[in-house]
Swiss-Prot record:
Belongs to the long (4 C-C) scorpion toxin superfamily. Sodium channel inhibitor family. Alpha subfamily. It comes from the Eukaryota. Residues 2-62 form the LCN-type CS-alpha/beta domain. One of its GO terms (cellular component) is extracellular region. It is found in: Secreted. Keywords: Amidation, Disulfide bond, Ion channel impairing toxin, Neurotoxin, Secreted, Toxin, Voltage-gated sodium channel impairing toxin. It comes from Tityus fasciolatus (Central Brazilian scorpion). GO terms for molecular function: sodium channel inhibitor activity; toxin activity. Has the structural arrangement of an alpha-helix connected to antiparallel beta-sheets by disulfide bonds (CS-alpha/beta). Expressed by the venom gland. This is Alpha-toxin Tf4. The keyword Disulfide bond applies. One of its GO terms (biological process) is defense response.
């Protein structure tokens, strides 16, 4: 798998600015990642499937 900042439907990072502990781990697992954490201020996932969309600075429109 791959790792990175999971992208939402707009291609933006998933914020964890105001979220509780464990939020990013849950969000990442919903995207079939093995785990995740809050790399403040955005979620970062490990073990994402290759098909998962991740934030890319080259295509960032956020």
């Amino acid at each position: 798998g791959k790792e990175g900042y999971p992208a939402d439907s707009k291609g933006c990072k998933v914020t964890c600015f105001f979220t509780g502990v464990g939020y990013c781990d849950t969000e990442c697992k919903l995207k079939k990642a093995s785990s995740g954490y809050c790399a403040w201020p955005a979620c970062y996932c490990y073990g994402l499937p290759d098909s998962a969309s991740v934030w890319d600075s080259a295509t960032n429109k956020c």
